[in-house]
Amino acid sequence: MSINGFLIAAPQSGSGKTTISLAIMAALRRRGLVVAPFKCGPDFIDPGYHRMASGRASINLDGWMCPESFVAETFRLHAEAADVAVIEAVMGLFDGLGASPLQGSSAQIAAICGAPVVLVVNARGMAASAAALVKGFAEFDPDVRLAGVIFNNVGSAGHAELLARVMASALPEIALLGCIPRDEALAIPSRHLGLVTAEDNPLPPEYLDRLADLAEKHLDLAGLAGLRITPRSVGASLSRTNGGGMLPVRIAVARDAAFCFVYQDNLRLLREAGGELLFFSPLADGALPEGISGIYLPGGYPELYAERLAVNVPMLDAIRGAARDGMPLYAECGGFIYLTRGMEDSQGAPLADFAGIFPVRARMLPKRKALGYRQVECLSVSILGPAGETARGHEFHYSEICEMPVDVTRTYSVTRQGAFLGQEGYCLSNCLASYVHLHFGSNPCLAPSLVAACRKFAATRRS
């Protein structure tokens, strides 16, 4: 099946690729096209904005967390259901974080997916030098196909004409797909890894309309929408499971402004393993969904909603009761904090009381505590699988756990690029909590193991 689409990249962060990606998504959607949005890397923030611009959930594509076969499979699965796929890059096009120079880079994703690259170049103060920069990117990696360029921060119509002449003369094989004029009012507030979330700072319809108008006026939208994906073979896809034909098992998944950081493929893989996902709000709901046999608490920013979470005592009681009954409960980062006794400031003064399943408090810090990719090895059996399994994910937080008791099982050995960071993945009964956001695509046993644990609990409860 043929797929139209492209990857929007840049030489470096701050070039305007997110704003331009949103403008293209909004404009193509307004033209009646179904847009499938994607984001390179582990970021949860830009996908929230993608959803607002495109009307569809954005999918993370990460070549470090997930095998290439999984990346190719999930891209094809989501892109085939749309008219055009728009992939937003992360950092500079060739900037990776893995052991090899390009692993984890947007260039790797472009190569895996066979996506042509559209390079967004900040042309402020440049003319012929801009073409030289584009030429370097076009020739750097033969596995990456640079199909077009968009110049951003163009100072005037004359500047745009000069850039067009230079490109036509020096690089006629690379399409000039538009010149975006300088407009500081179009910038999105600082949002890197969540300083501002899409839920906290939703894009107003009039802002999206302005972006769509900008794209209509200054970009070759037909040329962009006509770019074709060239599928490449990257090995066998990961095997899937549908739960062995058994009836679905209900799993409650927290989803609101406080708990909005989740990889969409985690939810898909849980469904494919036989999970029936029921969403609930720890902020607004007074009870858990009926008939559930498991709970998934994703990450987010509970510290921004601490008081509202703390006063929702019926929900806290329901979470405590589920844990007491032995229901499988998996929590990541913000979800983990929600399961502690509560939060305190950097001086130890209490801020809010939470579920108290783990006998410890989370302390907020003035500076970032952790950021980066993580690999975990399971030291013991848990609701995510047997001992010896490995998985990959990402960690980002401004809090720390204050002296977790030694009798609480540490399920994970955590490393960063091979360097040992410590043991966590705290386990009490059937509750597993960690600061690491695991991508279930990194290991095909994770989602089926969690669903199997929920199914086992359901069977025990029936008996």
Curated annotation (Swiss-Prot):
Keywords: ATP-binding, Cobalamin biosynthesis, Glutamine amidotransferase, Ligase, Magnesium, Nucleotide-binding. Its cofactor is Mg(2+). Residues 250-445 form the GATase cobBQ-type domain. The active site is at C333. InterPro entries: CbiA/CobB_synth (IPR004484), Class_I_gatase-like (IPR029062), CobQ/CobB/MinD/ParA_Nub-bd_dom (IPR002586), GATase_3 (IPR011698), P-loop_NTPase (IPR027417). Pfam families: CbiA (PF01656), GATase_3 (PF07685). GO terms for biological process: cobalamin biosynthetic process. Transmembrane segments: none annotated. It catalyses: cob(II)yrinate + 2 L-glutamine + 2 ATP + 2 H2O = cob(II)yrinate a,c diamide + 2 L-glutamate + 2 ADP + 2 phosphate + 2 H(+). HAMAP family: CobB_CbiA. The a and c carboxylates of cobyrinate are activated for nucleophilic attack via formation of a phosphorylated intermediate by ATP. CbiA catalyzes first the amidation of the c-carboxylate, and then that of the a-carboxylate. Belongs to the CobB/CbiA family. Catalyzes the ATP-dependent amidation of the two carboxylate groups at positions a and c of cobyrinate, using either L-glutamine or ammonia as the nitrogen source. This is Cobyrinate a,c-diamide synthase.
